[in-house]
Amino acid sequence: KFLAGRAYKKPEGEMKDEEYYRNSVETKDELIEELNQENYEEVISNNVEVIFGLASFKDEHTVNIKTAEEECDVYTERVFINTGASPFVPPIEGLKIEKRIHTNETLMDLEEYPETLAILGAGIIGLEFAATYAKFGSKVTIIDKASRLLPKEDADVAEEVFKSYKDLGVDFVFDADVSKVEQDESSVHIFYSSNGEKGELRANDFLVATGRKPNVEELKLENAGIES
């Protein structure tokens, strides 16, 4: 949200796009570090013990925790599972979150300004990042399987949203299935088919915004009788 706010406040002509973007990322990192420390101190000051490690259920009342130094079991009457979610990455040839291919979590750490950005997925996450980076000055292209923007919304509403993004300079490729992704040191090469025709797109960076999945893979929920 901080980066989005900075993008919409970008002053005209006072600073180069790449310089303003880099400054925004650095300020965001400083703010996150400060808030994390404040939140941690507030938690431990309220008689809460914090253990950093990998947790999994042994049974419905026992949680095993493996830290860098030791392993222990914690018994509890109740467990509140608050492990959040992580980005879902579809099984596409060559699609790995590394170098110039990002999720919404890693793109925000990108210090190098992307002059061109391709986004896979036109959901809320994809649209938010498209608007943010278009405001920063990037040339953004969104690739999506649907035949139009926001297919679950009324057509007239979706059309107005579509027009607002076109006004930002965002391009769209609809009815698209990505078959392969290649990347090198300077760009990402995206291969797709749309309406029976093959297409290709190159961009400096590629954001995968295809939804999220719960972080429960390591919890061994079945040991606690929890179905996921």
Residue ranges and their predicted role:
Residues K1-Y113, A146-L150, D156-V157, S164-L168, ...:
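Glycine-rich flavin
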Residues F80, L117-L120, Y133, V140, ...:
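Hydrophobic packing within well-folded, soluble alpha/beta domains
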Residues K96-R100, F136, E159, N223-I226:
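Glycine-rich, phosphate-binding/catalytic loops in enzymes
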Residues E128, K135, E159-E160, D167:
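Alpha-helical macromolecular-interaction surfaces
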Residues S147-R148, E159, K166-S228:
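Internal nucleotide-binding/catalytic subdomain
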